[in-house]
């Protein structure tokens, strides 16, 4: 089961060494679920893949700027920075309405 936290509170979800973590401003939760399972579960809630290891909550993105190699640097609303890989940059830009 998912940890008890509001979906809107999740900044991003990260997979590290076969473990999956949900990050909120106050806490980090570990879940048994795999990243692809959470992605399927949350796709209607404005969560998007940022890299092979990270899913971000688009509602919590404060700003973005281009990086070298067609990547993006996102600043979340808690000031944390996340790199979006080239593979997912276009999807994120489209979802945010950036051309």
PLM features: what roles do these ranges have?
Residues 1-83:
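Conserved binding/recognition cores within well-folded domains
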Residues 94-99:
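Short, charged, intrinsically disordered terminal tails
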């Amino acid at each position: 089961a998912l940890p008890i936290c509001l979906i809107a509170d999740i900044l991003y979800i990260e997979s590290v060494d076969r473990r999956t973590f949900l990050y909120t401003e106050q806490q980090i939760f570990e879940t048994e679920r795999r990243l692809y399972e959470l992605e399927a579960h949350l796709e209607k809630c404005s969560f998007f893949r940022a890299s092979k290891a990270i899913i971000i909550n688009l509602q919590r993105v404060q700003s973005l700027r281009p990086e070298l190699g067609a990547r993006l640097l996102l600043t979340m609303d808690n000031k944390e920075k996340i790199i979006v890989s080239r593979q997912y940059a276009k999807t994120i830009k489209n979802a945010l309405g950036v051309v």
